[in-house]
Amino acid sequence: MLKKTFAALALGTALLSAGQAMAAEYKIDKEGQHAFVDWKISHLGYSFIHGTFKDFDGNFSWDSAKPEASKISVDLKTASLWSNHAERDKHIASADFLDVKKYPDAKFVSTSVKSTGDKTADVTGDLTMHGVTKPVTFKATFNGEGKDPWGGERAGFNATTTLNLNDFGIKGPGATSQTLDLDISVEGVKQK
């Protein structure tokens, strides 16, 4: 009787395990310049300033059969901001805005992924920036996955969101500069 019970338990466990999707782990390919964290903010309501953060790292888990089980974590060095204008970058990095000396890091950790279409999802998580943690939702698009020419496997995504800087204790220079658009493009290398 004990043998039959154990065999049934083992078979049930095997069937349950086979039915569960296994998310693969990916490292964001920043070193190969296949990942970007770009931003855009209004300049006096007349135009937009575009920039990027050059120093960040992260990883994500992904299973195309079960995207809701995906997770992502990104760490960013705020002093790595770049807008192609050294004096402006210095001002944005100052205590007037990002205060990168006091707040050198920003971090996003997902808490949920909700599919919104065949290749789209809302990725919600906690964004910590300027010493404040707030929930943020990114609109994400799955670009594709497959083998690369170097024998590895990759998956790629784009994600966008708009942040209200006041929510993070950052005072923009005027009413037209209170929101910041983030556009993230990542390609991850599957970890073995």
Curated annotation (Swiss-Prot):
Localization: Periplasm
Signal sequence, renumbered to the chain: 1-23
GO cellular component: periplasmic space
Pfam family membership, one: YceI
Principal location: periplasm
Keyword terms: Periplasm, Signal
Gene3D superfamilies: Lipid/polyisoprenoid-binding, YceI-like
InterPro entries from the UniProt entry: Lipid/polyisoprenoid-bd_YceI, TTHA0802/YceI-like_sf, UPF0312/YceI
Family: Belongs to the UPF0312 family. Type 1 subfamily.
Record's protein name: UPF0312 protein PP_4981
